[in-house]
Amino acid sequence: MNKIMGKYKNGNYQVIIQKDGTKIRETQEEQFLPEFAENIDVKICNRCDMGCVMCHEDSTPNGKLGDILNQKWVDSLKPYQELAVGGGNVLEHPDLIPFLKKLKEKQVIANLTLHQEHFEYNEKLIKGLIDEKLIYGIGISLSDPTIEFIRKVRKYQNAVIHVINGIVKEDDIKMLSDHSLKILILGYKNIRRGTLYLKKEETLIRDRQKWLYDNMEYLFRHFKVVSFDNLAIEQLDIKRFLTKEEWDEFYMGDDGTSTFYIDTVERTFSK
C-alpha cells in the first residue's frame, strides 16, 4: 500500500498525495471547487544549450535567468502544494538549490523538469537533490531512448519521461516499452520555434501524430503509467477510451481550474 506524503484541504475537497506521486481528491459535493492552485508550473530561466527545434520557450545558451529568491508569491505557498520547476536548463540557474531549500522549508513538493542529456550528465546531482528531499519527481524530456538511459530512469520511482505528440517516433515508443516506465505525453505547441518547425516538417509531424493517435492502446498496455497534458488530451482525443464515469474520475480539470503558470524571467503569470 502506498504511503501518504501529505494531505490538505482545498476549498470543498481534500487532496491526498502518496509517495509514488499518486494524487487523490475527495469531496462530498457535486464538483471540486478549489481555493488555490494545487500545481504551479514555474519557469526559472530561459537558458539552455540544447537548441531543440520545437522549443516553444525559444531558450538559448545566453537566455535570461529569473530572480527566483525574491518572488513574493513563494511566501503564500501552502504545505504540499506542488511546483514543477522548469524552463531551459534549470541546473544552470545559480540560485536553484537555495530556491529548493526555501520550498522544502515550506513543505512544498518540488519537481524538476529537464532535458534527457542534462539528466544523464548531472545524475549524481539529481540523486543528491532527491536524497536531500529537495525534489521529489523528475520530468525528463526524451531525446534518445538508449538502454543506458532506461536503466538510469528505472532507478527513480517518481521519474516520468516526457514526449511530445508529433516529435516522438514509433521507434522511441517501442524502445521504451515493457520497462515499467511512466510516460507523459505533451501536446504539440504551435508557437515560437514550434511554429517554424511545423512549417518545415508538417508531413513528418502529422504522420507521427497519426501513428500515436492510432496506437494509444499499445501504450496503455506497455507502460506502467501513461498521462497527458490537456493539449495532448485534445489532440489525441483521449476521451474516446473512457466511459463518462471513468472520465469524471480521472480527468484533473481544465487548465486554470487547479493549476497556475508563473514565468519568473518575464515576470508574468497565467492560469
Tell what function each PLM region has:
Residues N12, T22, V53, R267-T268:
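Residue-level signal for well-ordered, solvent-exposed loop/turn and beta-edge residues enriched
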Residues M1-V42, E246-W247, T257:
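N-terminal [4Fe-4S]-dependent radical SAM core
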Residues E30-L69:
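Canonical Radical SAM [4Fe-4S] cluster-binding loop centered on the CxxxCxxC motif
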Residues K133-S270:
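Radical SAM enzyme [4Fe-4S]-AdoMet core and its adjacent flexible, acidic
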Residues R25, S270-K271:
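A sequence-level detector of short linear motifs
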Residues Q71-S76, I97-K101:
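Ankyrin repeat (ANK) tandem alpha-helical domains that serve as protein-protein interaction scaffolds
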Residues G51, G87, V265-E266:
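Residue-level recognition of short loop/turn positions
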Residues E57-I68, P79-H93, L103-N122, K127-E148, ...:
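Core AdoMet radical
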